[in-house]
Amino acid sequence: MNYHLMIDEKFTDDFIADAERNAPGNNIYLVSLYTPLPLRTKSPLIIYQRSVKKYWFSRIAPHLKSTDQVFIHWLDRRVFDIVLSLPRGMNVGIFSWMGDLIATPTCLFEKEILKPISYAFFKKKKRFRFQKDRSRGEIYNLLLFGRHLWRIVTAPLEWNKKKKVMQRINLFFHWNEFDYHWVKNHYPGFHARLVYFVYDVGLDSTLPVHPIVKDDREKLTIWLGNSATVTNNHFEALEELSHLREERIEIICPLSYGEHPDSVYTRQLIEKGKHIFGNKFIPLLTYLDRDQYYAMFQKVDLVLMNHIRSQAAGNVFAFLKVGKIIFMEEKSTLYQLLRSENIEQIYPMSELQHYSFSALQALTIKGHTNKNGTEIINKRLKERNLKKYLQ
């Protein structure tokens, strides 16, 4: 039997459908639920638990067999003890998003993945600081504050335990070998085998097939980042664009995912965007479903993804699929992968400030004859590996 330790996230149902197609009836799906009802998952095969750890040790651990396998879909401290309790000969795999390996414990890799202005903001406004949830009452926020303090105090212990967990994992399911090498370099003793797998990131959804044809008198529409998180390095990207402030541009900045719309980061980002660009800076604060979100791509001319850490792959592949030009941070493992595959639509962020308005206009109408980026996603290999490792 395959035991999947999962979270209530939007791609969980898609994975379950893939797993059941390749290994029907051979999987149990445990989802940690921190809200009264599931918000993003609907599969009837899911077993929801407030404490997956308690459920595991009372209901599953006594009946484990040596041939069983455990697969993690989001690695946090709630599953550490489960992994460390497993027999040595048992397969333990992680279907990696990378975010769980980079974002926790708090403040571990921020200096590496944030650019100077964003890191200065992080140190002053976010590191070790507690932000109230204004939609909840005082008692709830008091409990949150207690958890916040506990996470800070126990961060060194969490890191030591997490390294031991990573040493126990022997299968690393992921699609980007550059991410895999990042993990090997940052987690001592990690020697898991890389197995090709990619989550469904929605590229089969409705995407604009025929882009809007613009002439050189129309404004240039720029898409900035993918979420309201400091790892987008938004502040630096706005500085890189500032030489275009008087030009015919608009900047669409999606902020409905990540931090709350009234968070310090979101408010200061909007303030900076409006200060430099005025009404040309357009924050998206309302949640859109996937098809609505992708429908907006039709009007976009240019995309900026200033992340250093592995992030926004779904957005990047979707923009590539519809032929958009993307400027990316060169340290990004996704940038490194796309450049290694000779994807011509990708440009380094460091060159953006050297492009004039007219040069960017010309770039957006330039023809690209190579593969569009999504072709490097090997769905057949993904299906073969699911069948191989889950049956």
Q: Where are the regions a protein language model picked out?
A:
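Short N-terminal targeting/anchoring amphipathic segment
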Residues: 60-79, 91-95, 302-303
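A charged, aromatic-enriched C-terminal amphipathic alpha-helix characteristic of glycosyltransferases
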Residues: 355-391
